């Protein structure tokens, strides 16, 4: 005859199934990228800390949503959590572009300070859109990749120049280059087909996309350190019990510290790999540096006009740190 314990067993199994929460985490970069590896570690830490109650699945390389779609997906709870490049959304609100203002924060120490100065306003902005910021991690400093040698900004005239955010589109425009919108997941193909001849990005993305197979020159301009941010849908977060929320926040704090360290530690390694694979890694000429700085000043002025008193307060706070 059936055991009288069976109903209890079924109830226990059903209860554990109901208690388990599953989140999807779309990310735009390859599984081998340090940001993605950090996300996977974050998900594993959450799984372990919650005893399997919260399972986060990382979908790398824009396999679930393309880079520009991830924020909207989290906002609409199509994905409960996601990783975004903040500056992708600078047209939506200038605050998302504060970390790509050219030559404002060009080192990890400076980027940390700018992150700290802008975090309260960023928290508030995301909260107004139904999201919570869990953590940020900076990319290595941005340099200029080119198929041909560049001595001055005029050498970029007419060149197909990848733009991935409003700042890079504006730079292309001011240098007389031809802006082409290409996300990181499509960059390898764009180089192979000749759709792009020059771009600004980190040594990390250059290495991930094997830029050295198509591009000869990397100018180490150290223009800015853009940030990725991991955001969560506020309602999805609020639906977790307190212990699970605390586990997520602790794992996020650990991921932020680990991610920033990894980014800084790997900066020189990425440039060495580009060199080993035949690229010339060079400082920009004095003329090019001066021209870049001029463009940077214009972009900062433009940003301050759009960002208003809130933007000025952030840069003032950053300047005092």
Predicted regions and their residues:
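Short beta-strand-centered segments that line the small-molecule binding cleft or hinge
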Residues: 113
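Bacterial N-terminal signal peptides that target proteins for export
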Residues: 1-8
């Amino acid at each position: 005859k059936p055991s009288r314990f069976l109903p209890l067993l079924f109830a226990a199994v059903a209860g554990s199934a109901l208690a388990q929460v599953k989140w999807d985490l779309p990310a735009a970069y390859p599984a081998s990228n340090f940001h993605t590896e950090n996300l996977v570690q974050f998900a594993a830490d959450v799984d372990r800390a919650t005893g399997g109650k919260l399972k986060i699945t990382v979908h790398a390389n824009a396999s679930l949503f393309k880079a520009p779609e991830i924020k909207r997906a989290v906002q609409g709870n199509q994905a409960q959590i996601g990783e975004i490049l903040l500056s992708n959304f600078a047209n939506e609100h200038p605050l998302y572009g504060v970390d790509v203002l050219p030559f404002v924060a060009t080192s990890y120490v400076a980027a940390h300070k700018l992150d700290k100065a802008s975090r309260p306003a960023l928290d508030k902005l995301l909260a107004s859109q139904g999201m919570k910021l869990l953590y940020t991690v900076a990319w290595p400093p941005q340099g200029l990749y080119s198929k041909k040698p560049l001595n001055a900004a005029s050498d970029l005239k007419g060149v197909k120049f990848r733009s991935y955010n409003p700042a890079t589109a504006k730079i292309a425009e001011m240098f007389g280059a031809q802006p082409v919108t290409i996300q990181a997941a499509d960059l390898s193909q764009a180089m192979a087909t000749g759709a792009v001849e020059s771009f600004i990005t980190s040594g990390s993305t250059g290495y991930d996309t094997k830029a050295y197979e198509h591009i000869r020159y990397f100018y180490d301009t150290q223009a800015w350190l853009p940030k990725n941010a991991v955001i969560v849908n506020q309602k999805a977060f609020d639906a977790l019990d307190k212990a699970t929320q605390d586990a997520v926040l602790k794992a996020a704090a650990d991921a932020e510290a680990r991610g920033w360290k990894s980014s800084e530690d790997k900066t020189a390694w990425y440039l060495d790999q580009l060199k080993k694979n035949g690229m010339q890694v060079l400082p920009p000429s004095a003329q090019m540096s001066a021209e870049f700085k001029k463009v940077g000043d214009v972009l900062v002025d433009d940003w301050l006009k759009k960002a208003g008193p809130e933007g000025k307060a952030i840069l003032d706070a950053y300047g005092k740190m």
